[in-house]
């Protein structure tokens, strides 16, 4: 999260950039006798503000899309709604306020611009935080279905009980594929059912039952369905799958699929029909 939120601090350089256009140094700006941004029109000031805001938002968006929510998880996990709010506040409203209040040589202009920059920085930091804590951290195979598990779905106490040290902390660079492996003893299974009913937690949110997907690939093939028959039935799923096949050069007969439950509905995970290797994710119908 820190990488994205560092962009927020750059909002405070708006004033410095405006002043630099008229030859005022950052040190000189501490002298209240020097009017800020003399000679700039409000349209120029708003345009500079817009460019800076757009650059900062683009940096935060890049990290969000490439690291925390790799395609197609951004739309599947509802990230687009928050993005709209962030863009509205950080890229649109800030420069509009500058357009309204800016007047070259206006007393108190430096303070006004500082307040706008602070407001935008706070909005960006808050948005980054929300996106960070709601990011998908594991894609869990349980029985014949994958499910996205978000950072705020897991308790620290439950993470600490994971048998594999790799699953005792939340991934920072995108979701990790894992599988749920339950004991075969019926008594233990009944105890797990009783525990989940009492705690209200589902098994996919209990990392102590996680194993690496690599250990589960062969079994995943037996739990999957052939892609070719599904393609022949048509529909949105077939359209998305056909698009992937055309772009990748893969054959439908070489692939199987397993349903993927996301916040916005059911998508699919395509796997190699022989090895069980993950090939790609198909988004749900939105």
Language model segments and positions:
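Extracytosolic and intramembrane catalytic regions of membrane-associated proteins
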Residues: 158-286
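Lipid-exposed faces of alpha-helical membrane segments in multi-pass integral membrane proteins
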Residues: 48-60, 89-93, 115, 119-125
